[in-house]
Amino acid sequence: MAKEEEKLRQKASPENPEELGDLRRGRPAKSAAGLPAVTSSMKHAFRESGIGRAAASWIGLNQKNGFDCPSCAWPDPDGHRAKTEFCENGAKAVASEAANKNRCDAAFFEKWSVEDLAAQSDHWHELQGRLTEPVVLREGASHYEPIDWDEAFCLVADELNALDSPDEAVFYTSGRTVNEAAFLYQLFVRLFGTNNLPDCSNMCHESSGAALKPTIGIGKGTVSLDDFEKAESIFIFGQNPGTNHPRMLSSLQVARRNGCSIIAVNPLKEAGLLGFAHPQEARGLLGMATPLTSQFLQVRLNGDMALLKGMQ
């Protein structure tokens, strides 16, 4: 029986299952947002939590006395903020959070094996809800087993105390952990004897930080959100704000209207870099988009390095 369970565990892939579904063909869009973004957000909110519940959560989204959107890390304005200081992605993310009341309890883990869980998508896992208690995967087992908190703490303590040095441990956490929990967590780690405290921002920005430090002396960006409005030129390499952080499109729109030259470098022409129909403007709702990029350099894959060297 143990050998059979081990075989089942080995079949479980750490990669997400590849599923190609709902594929559509058509002419590529020439702009992002507009009325389709509003209607898509409303449909999602109505389906997930209902318009009333979603709207109640949207009121405080990215406001000074509210809460930060979990969808991306785009900064909030220091001064005036719109009543709807969020994008389509943020509206959908908050609506989903408000609607999800599911829980992953003992019955859930009794039903789903590790192999079965590995065959599901990230979106499916999100819809199952939150953990209600600690779980452990015993050696040779095919299912996670719920345990009480005392046993969970003992398991963690045994592993940590068995290390030759505290620096052999890495205490990874979320960059969106609330201040109180983050303070207690880092206090525990420092008392344990190490400062190995990475969070999710390290995965996103480690490469840019490594390049910025020898270049300008600090591993962080040195601009503020207001600088976008005053910039004479903005270069965007290998990203699509319309997908990654749509609120950036508002800042790019203001910069473009102020005469800024926006140069996009990407092998694929992304709609969000071509034009932006601001859904909070009448012309945007009517589909009249502001052209964003003054130049779109459609380099080949890995051609950005040659371009940068040519710009030196």
Residue ranges and their predicted role:
Residues 2-312:
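Catalytic alpha/large subunits of respiratory electron-transfer oxidoreductases
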